[in-house]
Structure formats: structure tokens, C-alpha cells
Amino acid sequence: LQVYEGLPASGKTKAIISEMDRRRSLGDQVMLILSNEHEELTRRPDGREGGRMGCRDSTKKFQIDRVIGTAEACEWLAEQVAGSLIVFDEAQYFDSKIVPAWLEASERGVDILVGTPSRMQLKALNGDQYDLKKLEVMCSCQKRNATRVMYSEDLTYPTHLCDRC
């Protein structure tokens, strides 16, 4: 079980797509799952099965396999086989009830990759074994790692700020 965390525009989705591409190139089954429980994802033109998840790097895209709710995701995960990679990007849009299904699938040998979990999901993991990949980005002052972002007119590229800026 791998968990990717970081501020917006820190490279989480790019890193996730790179890992999905790597695993698919090895011949592994790779599936990308998004939540249908929040309009932030489903109102996007590509936020559907067969759509393409992208990031700020226009060369990085990956086809979305399923757009489903938490209950369906839990049932679906129970059917997945060892050695496959199942990715939940923007995972914070799933209910925290999905966490036991992630853990159970992981224990069966299914590789689970979780991008941007909610605080409740992290709390539900409760110290269970997972590999945390925390992506850092420099503050705009270039002296320290950013701890927050600020959006102005551009909602795609936020300004990264540290505690002192």
C-alpha cells in the first residue's frame, strides 16, 4: 500500500502516472479508479470511465478505468487479483470506509496506490503498514519547503509558500 501526499502542484499525479506507466510496461494489470461522490471530479469533461487523467505535464496522461462510489469500490476491490496495481487518485473524495478494503486487498497481494487521501482516511489507516511518498515543493522564496499554497487568478498553478512567506 503506497500513499502519495503533497501540496497541490507538487507532482503527485505526475509521479502516480509515471508509476502506472512503469507497471503497465512490465505487463502488469493497472487500473485507475476515481470517485463519483464529489462533483469536483465528475463535472470535469474527462472525469468519466474512458476519460484521461492528466497533470500539469501535458505528456503524462492515463485512462480512467472506473468512476464509482465507495461501496462499489469496496466490493470491486474484493475481486481483484494479486500482482495488479489499483490506483485511487484524488482518494479524499471516497468515504473513509474504503480504508479496510485497501488494507484487505493489499494483504492479498494487490498493489494499492492512494493519491491524496483525506485526514480521516489517514486516521483510519491508524499506523498500518503503508509506504508514504510525501512530495515536497520549494516555496516561492526558494529558501524552504512550501507548507501551503495560495491561488490568485490562476487556479492551475498556485503560488507555493512557506511558513515565513
Predicted regions and their residues:
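Conserved P-loop
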Residues: L1-Q80, M120-G127, D154-H160
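Short linear motifs at secondary-structure transitions and domain/linker junctions
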Residues: E5-S10, F88, G109-I112
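A general structural motif
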Residues: G27, A82-S84, G109
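Short, hydrophobic beta-strand segments that form beta-sheet elements in well-ordered domains
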Residues: M31-L34, I86-D89, I112-T116
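Conserved P-loop NTPase "ATPase switch" module shared by AAA+ and STAND
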Residues: V81-F94
